[in-house]
Curated annotation (Swiss-Prot):
Catalytic activity: Exonucleolytic cleavage in either 5'- to 3'- or 3'- to 5'-direction to yield nucleoside 5'-phosphates
Primary enzyme class: hydrolase
Complex and partners: Heterooligomer composed of large and small subunits.
A cellular component annotation (GO) from this entry: cytosol
Compartment(s): Cytoplasm
Keyword set, alphabetical order: Cytoplasm, Exonuclease, Hydrolase, Nuclease
Main location: cytoplasm
Higher taxonomy: Bacteria, Pseudomonadati, Pseudomonadota, Alphaproteobacteria, Hyphomicrobiales
UniProt cross-references to InterPro entries, sorted A to Z: Exonuc_VII_S, Exonuc_VII_ssu_sf
Similarity field: Belongs to the XseB family.
Biological process, per Gene Ontology: DNA catabolic process
Documented EC number(s): 3.1.11.6
Name of the protein described by the UniProt record: Exodeoxyribonuclease 7 small subunit
Role noted for this protein: Bidirectionally degrades single-stranded DNA into large acid-insoluble oligonucleotides, which are then degraded further into small acid-soluble oligonucleotides.
C-alpha cells in the first residue's frame, strides 16, 4: 500500500489529519515497521501535526468571548483570552 504524498495534507480536514496522525503513532509504537518506512511515516506525521496545529490556531482565532453589560444583556464580543 502506498501512502499519499504530503501535498494532500494541505486540503485535509482536521479530523482526517488527526486520524492519520493517530495511525502513524500506533504504527511507530508497535515497533515492527522497517527503518526506511518508519522514517517516511514519521516525516508524514510531522507534516500532519503541523497542519493540525495550523487548523487549531485558525479556529482559536475565530472564537470570541461575548461581553455582557451591567444589565446582563450582551453588548458585543472581544477576542477570547489565550490560556
Amino acid at each position: 500500500m502506498t501512502e499519499p504524498s504530503n501535498a494532500d495534507i494541505a486540503v485535509m480536514s482536521f479530523e482526517d489529519a488527526l486520524k492519520q496522525l493517530e495511525k502513524i503513532v500506533d504504527d511507530l509504537e508497535r515497533g515492527d515497521v522497517p527503518l526506511e518506512e518508519s522514517i517516511r511515516i514519521y516525516e508524514r506525521g510531522e507534516a500532519l501535526k503541523k497542519h493540525c496545529d495550523t487548523l487549531l490556531k485558525s479556529a482559536e482565532d475565530k472564537v470570541e468571548k461575548i461581553r455582557i453589560g451591567r444589565d446582563g444583556q450582551p453588548v458585543g464580543t472581544e477576542p477570547l483570552d489565550p490560556e
